[in-house]
Amino acid sequence: MAKAKFERTKPHVNIGTIGHVDHGKTTLTAAITKVLHDQYPDLNESRAFDQIDNAPEERQRGITINISHVEYQTEKRHYAHVDAPGHADYIKNMITGAAQMDGAILVVAATDGPMPQTREHVLLARQVGVPYILVALNKADMVDDEELIELVEMEVRELLAAQDFDEDAPVVKVSALKALEGDEKWVKSVQELMAAVDESIPDPVRETDKPFLMPVEDVFTITGRGTVVTGRVERGVINVNEEVEIVGIRPTVTKTTVTGVEMFRKLLDQGQAGDNVGLLVRGIKREDVERGQVVVKPGTTTPHTEFEGSVYILSKDEGGRHTPFFNNYRPQFYFRTTDVTGVVTLPEGTEMVMPGDNTDIAVKLIQPVAMDEGLRFAIREGGRTVGAGRVTKIIK
């Protein structure tokens, strides 16, 4: 059966739910799909909680990661929504997942207020460049005391302001559970939330005019069709039958041709910046490509092993290191979708770097990574984020 073609009429926006575990991120995601399905039945499918909660597992370096993608539409926009699980072990996914957001819904339980993971997710959203955060104050049906809710709202606004997010962002009181149960008052609250999402998350500035680049997130084989490489197009446009290069991690550059582009299992003539797509690549075996590489327009991006970066090292309170590090520190540098070990050289006159410090460092990676100036990275130790930074200068 031929696949349905995907019509590109409305603005396409990538969003996600972030926040503390058990504050109701997944329940809210389910409630949004149900409420929008009931509001615009011809535009939306409803997704049950357990469909979203049983997110497909991705195993990444020994950690099982779950991430769920759903799509839905309001009158104004088409949304792709990632539900990022809340455990500290899954910060990795926050980094891969949150990097895919044009805006985020921060879910905070009105019964609890901001918790450690709430702060961690907001900090991470800042690090990975999420442009906008608005707030769903969930479980609002369980708090009768108006003053208590106002207090929680104030705390959340302070938290956003502390990371340079919009302090005046919408804070919408919702009850995801009651909305799922069809309680009219709370169904309306979710409609209000989505109206706020439509209004407050800016139309993404799509980077369609830049040369094509897509970080590889996954690679698999489709019997009879060949190898498919999936990821979110970071910039530019890819058309069927265009030549590309696969760059980074390995010593040689692989050249190939894209013979098909698909999104949400629908065929497209092209994929463009911001789209989560699968690219069918000609003459490439599954083992020829791996996560951490990038697919690019030929000749536009080169892999590098040495760079200078400006970094922030998390304080102990933010879940970072408890002790300073010195010259020749060897953490992992997390670029786009993968970790690469690197050796750090501190600036002259700097003996050590304390948790909570900002500093400039020079780094020598053990594998090449496709990079440009301005590229963001996380610094990690055994899967735990201990710092964040951006490339300021490429050396080699």
From Swiss-Prot:
Pfam families documented for this protein: GTP_EFTU, GTP_EFTU_D2, GTP_EFTU_D3
Binding positions (GTP): 19-26, 83-87, 138-141
Binding site for Mg(2+): T26
InterPro entries documented for this protein: EF-Tu_GTP-bd, EF-Tu_GTPase, EFTu-like_2, EFTU_2, G_TR_CS, P-loop_NTPase, Small_GTP-bd, T_Tr_GTP-bd_dom
Annotated region described as G3, given as residue ranges: 83-86
Annotated localization: Cytoplasm
Keywords: Cytoplasm, Elongation factor, GTP-binding, Hydrolase, Magnesium, Metal-binding, Nucleotide-binding, Protein biosynthesis
TM helices/strands, residue ranges: none
G2, as annotated region: 62-66
Residue span of region G5: 175-177
Subunit composition and interactions: Monomer.
Protein name as it appears in the record: Elongation factor Tu
Species: Mycolicibacterium gilvum (strain PYR-GCK) (Mycobacterium gilvum (strain PYR-GCK))
Lineage: Bacteria, Bacillati, Actinomycetota, Actinomycetes, Mycobacteriales
Gene: tuf
